[in-house]
């Protein structure tokens, strides 16, 4: 199995240096979070498998800090075949039982089963629409949206496009 990949995406500079005034960075000095923030967060992603990985990790995030999940990313990559949907979709109850003991991942059966379900959905979308990425990006006319937020507190809690996408998924 290939080694877990580092975050892909476009660089915005040296981690922890170039974006120190960004309000989305928070007060953290954790190198894992700074690398994610400076190289990945806010960058458009068009690779279907990379989007699948992010969706799977986000599903583990519910009720936990994002830093908790970031620190477990490599373990999730090992546990879930480097986020290769065609392998994950074939996982069974027995595989989930094994993952409930796998080190350094969240041992919540429903969350682990969610990744398997997401892989099956990913494969269906790839078949029906030709690309998971194109399907997701179609909700925003294939362009990143600048919501114009100056401060984190200005962010909307709910966006109608996100609500519709959630329903469609």
Task: Set out the residue ranges of the language-model regions.
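HhH-family (HhH-GPD) DNA N-glycosylase catalytic core used in base-excision repair
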Residues: 2-169
């Amino acid at each position: 199995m290939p080694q877990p990949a580092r975050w892909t995406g476009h660089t915005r500079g040296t981690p922890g240096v170039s974006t120190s005034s960004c309000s989305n960075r928070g007060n953290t000095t954790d190198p894992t979070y700074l690398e994610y923030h400076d190289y990945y967060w806010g960058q458009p992603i068009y690779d279907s498998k990379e989007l699948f990985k992010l969706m799977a990790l986000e599903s583990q995030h519910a009720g936990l800090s994002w830093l908790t999940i970031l620190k477990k990313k490599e373990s999730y990559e090992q546990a879930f075949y480097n986020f290769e949907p065609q392998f994950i979709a074939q996982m069974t109850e027995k595989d989930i039982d094994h993952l409930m003991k796998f080190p350094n991942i969240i041992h919540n059966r429903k969350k682990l089963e969610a990744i398997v379900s997401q892989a099956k959905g990913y494969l269906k979308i790839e078949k029906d629409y030709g690309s998971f990425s194109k399907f997701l990006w179609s909700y925003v006319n294939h362009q990143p949206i600048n919501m114009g937020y100056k401060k984190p507190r200005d962010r909307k809690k709910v966006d109608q496009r996100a609500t519709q996408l959630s329903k469609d998924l």
